[in-house]
Amino acid sequence: MADSSPASFLTQADALLRKNLVFQKRNIWSNIRLITIPFFLCLLLLVIQMLFDTQFNDVHGQCGCNEKTCGLRYSTSEQAAFCAIPNPPQWTPLLQIPAPEYRAAIPYPSHTSPATFLFTGNNQSLGNILMGNMYSNSSGFDGDLAYYVLGSSSFPAYTNHMDSAFISDLPIYNIQHECSPNSSFSILIHQSPLAFPKEVNCVQGLNLWRNSSSDVNNELFKGYRKGNPDKKINEFAGAFDFQNTNGNNLNVSVWYNSTYKNDTVVRPMALIRVPRLVNLASNAYLEFLKGSETKILFEYVKEMPKPETKLSLDIASLIGPLFFTWVILLLFPVILTTLVYEKQQRLRIMMKMHGLGDVPYWIVSYTYFLLISILYMLCFAIFGSLIGLNFFRLNDYSIQLVFFFICINLQISVAFLASAMFSDVKTATVIAYIYVFGTGLLGIFLFQFFLEDPLFPRGWIIAMELYPGFSLYRGLYELSQSAFAGDYRGIDGMKWRDFGNGMKEVTCIMLIEWLLLLGLAYYIDQIIYSRKHPLFFLLQSTSKKKQHFSDNKISKVVVEMEKPDVCREREKVEQCLLKSTRDSAVLCNNLKKVYSGKDGNPQKLAVRGLSLALPQGECFGMLGPNGAGKTSFINMMTGIIKPSSGTAFVQGLDILTDMDRIYTTIGVCPQHDLLWEKLSGREHLLFYGRLKNLKGSVLTQAVEESLRSVNLFHGGIGDKQVSKYSGGMKRRLSVAISLIGSPKVVYMDEPSTGLDPASRKSLWDVVKRAKRKGAIILTTHSMEEAEILCDRIGIFVDGSLQCIGNPKELKSRYGGSYVLTVTTSEEHEKEVEQLVHNISTNAKKIYRTAGTQKFELPKQEVKIGEVFKALEKAKTMFPVVAWGLADTTLEDVFIKVAQTS
C-alpha cells in the first residue's frame, strides 16, 4: 500500500545514493581512469628518480676501492664522504670566527682585526671577570689542544665525520687576550689513515661591554649586511648575556650566527659551532668560583658511526610540493564540474521539485565526493610507498592520513562554494584548471620564496596560507623537507614530535577553513539556489502575516479594472482565504512578479496580480502568447523564483514559507526534458518514485504502470539508457516522472511537444486519468490539446489573466459568429465580398490572400441554409474554387482575446 506521507530524510538519501551508484556504475571506466592517475604519476616520479640515480651513481659518487677493498685510503677527496666510518674521528671543538675581511672593526676590517665578543648583564664587574677568564694566556704549543681556545672561519660541515676546518686551506685561529710572537704555531692533525698539517694563527679576543641585551641585539643586527645603510658586514664572533649571574648562580644566554647552518632547500642543515661557546662560559664561571686550576676540558666532538653510502638525490621529495599539489588538486575540477553540470542542466532543481531536500542532497553528494577522494589518495599513497618514494615511506603514515583527510575535505568544501559562482560547465572547467596549475606554479615560485626568506614576516606567511592552495603547498613542503632530510641522514622523516615545524599551523588553518567554507557554501546555496532571504534563519511568522494582510488590501485596487469572469475568480479566492480550511488544490492570491530594469530599461511586469482557485480533480489550461507570463507563473509556483508580492497556497501550504513541504506533494513536467543520459527510463522512475515515498512492490508496480502508460514498456525500451531515446520518448518519460507517486498537483509545461499524433492521443489519456487524483496546471500552444484536456482555460496577455472559463463558455462568449472562407480567382474577389455583405450586412473580412478570403458572420443575422443557397448560386455566376463555413474555434477565441487586450 502506498504511503502518502512525505519521504523521510533516510528515504531521500537512499534514493539519491542508489541513483548516484547506478550513474557511477555507468561511468565505471571514467572512475577507473581517475583512480589510476596517481599510479601513473608515481611511475613518472620513479622514472625521473631512476634517471637521476643513473646520472649520479658513477665512481665519483661512491667510496673509492681497489680491486677488493673500499675505504678512505683508496678514495679521493670527493669519494671520502661516501665511505663507511665505523670508528669516527675525534675533532677538537672550535669557535666560529668571522673571516678577517668581515670582522667587526673600526674603521674597517683587516687581517689583524680582533675577534670581537659583546657581553652584558646585571653586574658589569662580574661580566668583566668572566670574560677575562675566557681565553688562555699560554704561548707556544704544549701538545694538548683542549687547553686552547681555537676557532675557524670555514663553513661548518653537515656532520662531524670530517671537520671542514682541518681539511681546508684556511688557518686555525688561537684566541688570546694579547697575541705574543709564540702565539702562532704549526700542528699535525692525525686521523688515520690521514694527517692534516695546519697553521694555528693567533687572533686577539676583544671583549666589549654593552648596557643591555637590546643594545647587543641592535649592534648584532647592524653588523648584518642588510642591517646598515652601507650594506657592509661587521660580524661579531659571539655575545653573552650573564643576566643575574652571581656567586651562587650562573644564568647566561649565548648569541651566535645561525646563518652558518645554511638551512635551505639546496642542501641540508650544517652543524653550527656553538658547544665551545657554552663551554667557555661554564669554565669562566668555574674559574671565578674555584680558581684557574678548575676546568671542564672540552676535548673533542665526535660523530656517530656511519655505513658506506652513495651519492643520491631524492628528486621526489625535492619536486614533491609542486608535483603533489597538482596531483591532489586534479580532483577539484572533477568535483566542481559535476556540481555545475547538475545546475546547468537543471537536474538538481528537478530533483528538488520532486521532493529531494537540500540536506539529503548535500550529505549524499558530499559523502560521494569524499569517498572518491579518499580512494584516490589511498591509491596515491599506496602506489608511492610500493615504488619506494621517500615522501610516503619515511614520513609517519598517521600524519599523512590526518593531513590528506583534512586537505580533501577542504577541497570538497571549496568546490561546493565555487559551484555557486558558475552556471556553465565549460567556464567552470577552465577556471578550475587555472586554479590547479596556477596554484602549483605560484607555490613554488612565489610562496616558497617567501617561506624560505627568514626576514619575511611570519604574519604574512599565515595570511598567504589562508588561500587553500598555499596551505596545501605548505603542508606538502614540510613533508617533503622532512623526507629529504631523513633520507640524507638515514633517519625517519616527520613524526608527531616534529609536528610543530609549520605542519601544526597549516593543519589548524585547513581544519578551520574546512568547517567555515562548508558552512558558507551551504548558506550561499540557500540564498542563491533555494532563493531564501539572507536572514532566513531569523525570520519569524509575523512577517508572513503582515505580507498576507497587505496583499488583500492590494487586491481591492485592481478589481474594478478586470473583466467580470476574472473578477469573479478573484472574489472566489478571497472567499476561500476567509475560510479556516482551504479545500482548493491551488489558491493564488494576487500573485505578482516584477523584474527590475537593467541598463536604463523600465521594470518588466511579468505577472500582474493573478488570483486563481483550482479545485481538486481539475485540469487548468494556461494559454497565451510568448512573454505573457506563463513561465514566470510556473516558476513562482515551483519555487524557482520568488513572487514580488502576493502568495499562493498548494494543498494549504504557502509557497513563501512552506516550499520544501510543497515539493513533496507536486509533480513537474518541465518544458525541456531534464534527464540523465546514462540512466534508463526505469531507473529515472525508480529514483523519483522513492522520492515520493514509494517502496517495495508498490514502487515496482507504479514504475511498471508508468512505463506502460507512456508506451515505454514493450521491447525493453524502459531499460535502455535515455541517451538512446528519441525526443518524443524523452518527452513521454518526463510526463511519467511528473505523475509517478500520484502527486496532488502537477505542473505540465507543453507536455506533448514533439510527439506524433498516436503518442499524443495516448498521452492525453494518461493526463485525463491523472487529473482524477489531483489538480493539473497545463501550458500549451495546441488548442486541440487544451480543448480536450482542460476543464477550464485561462488566457494570459502581458502578465494579466484576460479571461477564464471552460472551452465552451469561452467560445460562446468570444465567438458569436461563423467564419466563412471562400477561394476564387483574384479578379472575382469583389463579387465574393458583395455576396457576403448581401448575406450579412455586418459581415467583417478578417483575412485575404491570393483569392482566399475569410469573413466573420454574426450568428444572429444569418442562417446556415441561406449561406449554402447563396454559395450555390454564386457558383453559377463565377468560378468558386473552394468554400467553407465553420463555427468559432478556441484558436479564434485566443487570437481575438490576444488582439483586443
UniProtKB/Swiss-Prot annotation:
Keyword tags: ATP-binding, Membrane, Nucleotide-binding, Transmembrane, Transmembrane helix, Transport
Primary location recorded for the protein, binned into one broad class: membrane
Protein name as annotated: ABC transporter A family member 8
Gene3D superfamilies named among the record's database cross-references: P-loop containing nucleotide triphosphate hydrolases
Cell location: Membrane
PROSITE patterns: ABC_TRANSPORTER_1 (PS00211), ABC_TRANSPORTER_2 (PS50893)
Membrane topology: Multi-pass membrane protein
InterPro entries: AAA+_ATPase, ABC2_TM, ABC_transporter-like_ATP-bd, ABC_transporter-like_CS, ABCA, P-loop_NTPase
Family classification: Belongs to the ABC transporter superfamily. ABCA family. CPR flippase (TC 3.A.1.211) subfamily.
Residues at which ATP binds: G624, P625, N626, G627, A628, G629, K630, T631
Disulfide bond entries: none
Chain ranges of the ABC transporter domain: 586-823
GO MF terms, alphabetically ordered: ABC-type transporter activity; ATP binding; ATP hydrolysis activity
Sequence intervals crossing the membrane: 34-54, 315-335, 369-389, 402-422, 427-447, 460-477, 508-528
A Pfam family it matches: ABCA12_C
Any one of the GO CC terms: membrane
